[in-house]
UniProtKB/Swiss-Prot annotation:
Fourteen ClpP subunits assemble into 2 heptameric rings which stack back to back to give a disk-like structure with a central cavity, resembling the structure of eukaryotic proteasomes. It comes from the Bacteria. It is found in: Cytoplasm. InterPro entries: ClpP (IPR001907), ClpP/crotonase-like_dom_sf (IPR029045), ClpP/TepA (IPR023562), ClpP_His_AS (IPR033135). It comes from Thermobifida fusca (strain YX). Belongs to the peptidase S14 family. Keywords: Cytoplasm, Hydrolase, Protease, Serine protease. The active site is at 100 (nucleophile), 125. GO terms for cellular component: cytoplasm; endopeptidase Clp complex. GO terms for molecular function: ATP-dependent peptidase activity; ATPase binding; serine-type endopeptidase activity. This is ATP-dependent Clp protease proteolytic subunit 2. Pfam families: CLP_protease. The keyword Nucleotidyltransferase does not apply. The gene is clpP2.
Amino acid sequence: MPPTHNEFMRTDVPMQPMYEQTAQRLLRQRIVFLGQQVDDEIANRIVGELLLLSAEDRERDITLYINSPGGSVTAGMAIYDVMQYIPNDVRTVGIGLAASMGQMLLCAGTRGKRYALPHTRIMMHQPSGGIGGTASDIRILADQLLYVKKMFLERISLHTGQPVEQIEKDADRDRWFTAQEALEYGFIDEVLTNTPDVTGGRS
């Protein structure tokens, strides 16, 4: 028996947002999408999806699409660490904008499988944060900023092959890259021009 008009109009059944429906369909193709600022909530979702896909098949590739202005360092590094932790190759594909932590995650994909679409913009800069409070508080926060900066420089150097000193100089202020410039710098391995270049789950 087909549903009645009243059943269509029921409000006691929560409707799944269209974005969530799309995300679930992408997940079935082993595609994870980061399309916003990185915070704890989105990081926990992406970490969970990476772990789930790895548990389902420890050999097939996972593809992470990135369109993000950056965000929380701790949240972003949770994603980063899981990308390195799971045995699967993680393809990264930059679309639109990969800035700050988005840039870090883009270059952290498996070597040879890091991509960007032609008009993607990539931005690198040093970590920043507000400092205030007592002298002791300021000293503690300053030490943490120095630690994060050193970690970022070392990680970016590892993934790009650029010397730490060069990255430190380039990241002193916002440094913008086109997709081609990002390729030359070592953030990515290829600029994609059509969809057959990268697929969802094949290794």
